[in-house]
Amino acid sequence: KVWLAEPAGVAEAWTLAILLAEEKLYGRTEVFATVGSDELLFDMRKATLPVAQLTQSQARYEASGGKGLLSDYFELANGEARLLPRLRERITWAQYNLVTDASFNEFHGIICRRALPDFGPLLRQRVLRLFRDSLSLFGVLGLDREFSPTDATVGDYQPLFENGGWYKRVR
């Protein structure tokens, strides 16, 4: 189970789905993508991308190690692209408030690359505790930036890389 908290857009969830499919992990992975409002939830569930944007993304896809054609993962109709149903069905979209809602599941991975910069120090600490409480031991946490030494949960994680906000929960 992977929680994608407050993705920047539907493309972030679709990118994760494609990555997991290429690594042969998608069939046994559930992605929970949460957004802060019902309006965003509606938009994400119905979203499409212009085919031209998909074509422009092909070079970035190849540069990041993508295999084959990016368009192989999409239905194309009327100048729009939508992720294939077999990939969309493993993404559960839900409305969720990072500040006020409680943990709703235990995850092996949590990715939050966009929302934390919007929060002040107190709310950031609350959300980081929520992520710790929702992440299984040895689960992976991906954040927008590295932990600060003053972050309440910093001792619960081990960095996965020298630079960047990727961590493994160790306690």
Where does each model-flagged region fall?
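Short helix-capping segments at alpha-helix termini
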Residues: E22-G27
